[in-house]
């Protein structure tokens, strides 16, 4: 096993499932020809044991063993709650 646990920061885009959330992770990628930095988004499913997240929250997630067909991340903490 590696010593470093893989963690990411992202924004919750869906919390309609029970004990699950969908997190959008944004990253900047340099265009290979034009050199401009472009935003790319990856959506991952994460486990939220206590259903504490809401849409728009900024969260920290970490990689874990596969929990289902699409879920292999788990919630570490809610960094910032969404402003209503």
Curated annotation (Swiss-Prot):
Keyword Ribonucleoprotein tagged? yes
Q: Which UniProt keywords apply?
A: Ribonucleoprotein, Ribosomal protein, RNA-binding, rRNA-binding
- One matching Pfam family is Ribosomal_S17
> Domain of life here?
Bacteria
GO-annotated cellular components: cytosolic small ribosomal subunit
User: InterPro entries, from UniProt?
Assistant: NA-bd_OB-fold, Ribosomal_uS17, Ribosomal_uS17_bact/chlr, Ribosomal_uS17_CS
From the UniProt record, list the coiled-coil ranges: none
Q: Which SUPFAM superfamilies match?
A: Nucleic acid-binding proteins
Asked if the Swiss-Prot or TrEMBL record annotates the protein with the keyword Ion transport, the reply is no
GO molecular function terms attached to this record = rRNA binding; structural constituent of ribosome
NCBIfam families attached to this UniProt entry: PRK05610.1, uS17_bact
Its family?
Answer: Belongs to the universal ribosomal protein uS17 family.
What is known about its subunit structure? Part of the 30S ribosomal subunit.
The free-text function statement in the UniProt record for this protein reads: One of the primary rRNA binding proteins, it binds specifically to the 5'-end of 16S ribosomal RNA.
Q: What is this protein called?
A: Small ribosomal subunit protein uS17
This chain's source organism reads Vibrio vulnificus (strain YJ016)
The organism that produces this protein has a lineage beginning with: Bacteria, Pseudomonadati, Pseudomonadota, Gammaproteobacteria, Vibrionales
């Amino acid at each position: 096993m590696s010593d470093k646990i893989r963690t990411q920061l992202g924004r919750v885009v869906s919390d309609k499932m029970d004990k699950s959330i969908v997190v959008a992770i944004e990253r900047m990628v340099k265009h290979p020809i034009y050199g401009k930095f472009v935003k790319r988004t990856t959506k991952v499913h994460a486990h939220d044991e206590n259903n504490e997240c809401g849409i728009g929250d900024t969260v920290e997630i970490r990689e874990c063993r596969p929990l289902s067909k699409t879920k292999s991340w788990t919630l570490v903490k809610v960094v910032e709650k969404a402003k209503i």
